[in-house]
A protein has these predicted regions:
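Active-site recognition of the HExxH zinc-binding catalytic motif
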Residues: 18-30, 239-240, 248
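A structural supersecondary motif
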Residues: 50, 219-221, 242-250
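An aromatic/glycine/proline-enriched structural segment found at the starts
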Residues: 126-134, 159, 163-226, 244
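M16 family metallopeptidases and their MPP-like homologs
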Residues: 1-26, 35-84, 98, 102, ...
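A common structural junction motif
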Residues: 80-89, 182-190
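Acidic/histidine-enriched alpha-helical segments
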Residues: 37, 41-46, 88-106, 171, ...
């Protein structure tokens, strides 16, 4: 059984605190219901399950892959529910992850591909939240406080802001019971407001950045369309025909 619980709790919700959504997502499985990160990982492994968290600009998610046998699925679901409903948000874990994130950001800034990506988003989206780095910057992460993480969790990790996806050996009734078991303890809360529309580009831009790399990295693009647009999939396929989807020089 594959389960994906998605919340509209990505980086666009950071509200001036770049990296807040990313930090909140990261801390979910660093400690929950009194279990440490190692204990959570060990329990999942002992059940043959895979548990993970992640976030991006639009969303944050918690995933579980488990055997469908109730002897394994039920304790795995309990673990998933604890991570979603009872994160500890321990100060020690927060300080460690804040430092680790800063190190990762500094390392990423040495990558020409990453520098090109960040510059592209900033140039394309301007003042829109999509322009911000989901992981934050060294300075924005240093300024984060644990109380901000807890407040972000309380606002966005609520039932009305969740989408539950299940694929596997379950009928509808069992799936509904599973959803109730996992997020039934969450407060109803409110659905996150829609993200502001992306402004259209008014002129072409060119950014050149020196980097001591053996290769040149080039990014070109512009705001496209919404997933629900009837032309989305024809253009998606057409992009692959033109070489999109991983074409390399080989």
């Amino acid at each position: 059984v594959d389960i994906n619980v998605t919340f509209a709790a990505g980086g666009v919700r950071d509200d001036g605190h770049a990296g807040l959504a990313h930090m909140t997502s990261t801390l979910l499985d660093m400690g929950a219901a009194g279990l440490s990160a190692d204990e959570i990982s060990s329990r999942a492994e002992s059940l043959g399950a895979e548990l993970g968290t992640g976030s991006a600009r639009d969303m944050a998610w918690i995933t579980l892959r488990s055997l469908s046998d109730p002897a394994y699925l039920q304790p795995a679901l309990k673990l998933l529910a604890d991570v979603i409903n009872k994160p500890d948000f321990n100060e020690r874990d927060f300080v460690r992850e804040r430092e680790r994130t800063q190190v990762a950001i500094r390392r990423s800034e040495q990558s020409p591909a990453t520098v090109a990506e960040y510059t592209f988003f900033q140039s394309t989206y301007g003042d829109h939240p999509y322009a911000l780095r989901p992981a934050g910057t060294v300075d924005s992460i240093a300024a984060l406080q644990l109380d901000q993480v807890k407040a972000f969790y309380r606002q966005y990790y609520v039932a009305r802001n969740a989408v539950f996806s299940i694929v596997g050996d379950l009928d509808r009734k069992a799936a509904e019971q599973l959803v109730e078991q996992v997020i039934g303890q969450l407060p109803a809360g409110k659905r996150a407001p829609a993200v502001a529309s992306v402004p259209e580009l008014t002129r072409a831009q060119e950014q050149r950045i020196y980097h001591p790399s053996t290769q040149t990295h080039i990014r070109m693009g512009a705001p496209g369309m919404h997933r629900g647009d009837p032309d989305y999939f024809p253009l998606y396929v057409g992009n692959h025909v033109l070489g999109g989807g991983g074409l390399v020089s080989h």
